[in-house]
Design a protein with these regions (language model features):
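N-terminal active-site segment of His-dependent metallophosphoesterases
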Residues: 1-68, 72, 362-372, 376
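Short amphipathic alpha-helical segments and helix-helix/interface helices
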Residues: 32, 64-68, 94, 157-158, ...
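Accessory, non-catalytic peripheral segments of nucleic-acid enzymes
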Residues: 37, 42, 247-379
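A short helix->loop->beta-strand "cap" motif at the edges of active sites that frequently abuts
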Residues: 72-77, 166
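His/Asp/Glu-rich metal-coordinating catalytic cores
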Residues: 55, 84-218
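Divalent metal-coordination and catalytic microenvironments
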Residues: 8, 28, 43, 48, ...
């Protein structure tokens, strides 16, 4: 049985105040084209369908277009809510959608029952587990000693108890200990929301969502597929892909990926203003990509953001890397302050801000201004 594993669509997301909706539709169309050439038996959507609990109307319309496109291809869809989603909103109409083989995890009310599929090797049980917090599980199982995310997940998965003689797939949205995170994910405080990878041992394949980098955790079949698009510059050097999973007889799982090409890549550029505005440096490149530019000029370039956007219209972020920004000079102790002249105070301030000393010309000019001010005060 073949599956396409997707997660973390984050429909409606904005990156540096740039809307990703057009890029998201583009990549979803590409995924549909992949499915037309690499047929599967079902699609797994492992949470964070939306970027916010109350998504914008345009994001809702985009998902409302994508799910029927999958259903029109006679593909069962198994979707769960993630930590960015509202479980209640994602589950709206779930009973009606199930009639079109679009199965959406309900609001958590206890261990999920398996949804069976069948192929030439027999049944495959699909378990849909939405994003869990300890408080959710304590509410359903008040007699269980649940202090951590691992306690909560373990409590639920013990009740799932997949049949070891049958193949089973779990769709979940949790932070598994040992996985690598990105800047675009919701911050984790001290790893408190981590869960133990061993909790998933009873499942043949675990389709995970939540982390944006494609990766396995421990075994190959405990896997994050990652986002279909880059959502932070910490992902600039990643190669996004769609994950295909094939279940053979019990114990045989084959994984493969297909590259996804975005409408606009998310890249980083570095150089001086003169270098980056030289036609030879950008001719033939995708200047409409989403960019983070780091200027190496020692002096700030006036109106640099607007001027660079003439060439790079989707410049998202502009920073400087120079002596001023690289290190910070130490502040003088108060005891030394009283012994310094006004020019020495200003020179120390200038060095603190720019990490380089006043030139002789600048010092002479400042001394002249100071003497003029002192004369005006004395008068």
């Amino acid at each position: 049985m073949r599956f396409l594993h997707l997660s973390d669509l984050h429909l409606g997301k904005r990156v540096c105040e740039f809307s990703m909706l057009d890029d998201q539709r583009y990549i979803l169309e590409q995924i549909l084209s992949l499915l037309d050439t690499r047929p599967v038996d079902a699609v797994l959507l492992a949470g964070d369908l939306y970027d916010k609990p109350v998504p914008p109307a345009e994001a809702v319309r985009l998902l409302d277009w994508f799910l029927p496109e999958l259903a029109d291809r006679k593909l069962p869809v198994f979707a769960i809510s993630g930590n960015h989603d509202s479980a209640e909103r994602v589950a709206f109409g779930a009973h009606l959608l199930a009639g079109s083989q679009v199965y959406v995890s309900p609001v958590f009310e206890g261990a999920p029952a398996p949804i069976p599929l069948t192929d030439a090797y027999g049944p495959v049980d699909i378990y849909l587990l939405p994003f869990l917090k300890p408080a959710m599980v304590r509410h359903i199982y008040p007699d269980e000693p649940i202090e951590s995310y691992s306690d909560a997940l373990g409590c639920v998965l013990r009740r799932c108890a997949p049949d070891p003689a049958r193949r089973s797939v779990l769709v979940a949205h949790q932070f598994v200990a040992g996985a690598a995170a990105c800047e675009s994910e919701e911050p984790s405080v001290g790893g408190l929301d981590c869960v133990d990878a061993a909790l998933f041992d009873g499942f043949d394949y675990v389709a995970l969502g939540h982390l944006h980098s494609p990766q396995k955790v421990g075994r190959d079949t405990l896997r994050y597929c990652g986002t279909p698009l880059k959502y932070s510059f910490s992902e600039a050097h990643q190669h996004k892909s769609a994950t295909f999973v094939e279940l053979g007889p019990k114990g045989e799982v084959t994984l493969s990926t297909a590259p996804l090409t975005p409408k606009h890549d998310l890249r980083e550029l570095r150089g001086s203003y003169m270098e980056l505005t030289d036609r030879r440096s950008y001719a033939g490149t995708a200047t409409d990509d989403y960019l983070h530019i780091t200027l190496t000029d020692e002096q700030d370039v006036p109106d640099a953001l607007a001027r660079l956007r003439v060439i790079y219209p989707n410049l998202m972020r502009l920073d400087y890397d120079n002596l001023r920004t690289r290190t910070q000079a130490d502040l003088d102790a108060p005891a030394q302050t009283e012994q310094k002249t006004p020019l020495e105070h200003f020179a120390a301030f200038y060095a603190l801000q720019n990490n380089q000393p006043l030139s002789a010309e600048q010092a002479a000019f400042c001394q002249q201004l100071i003497e003029t001010l002192w004369k005006e005060e004395d008068a």
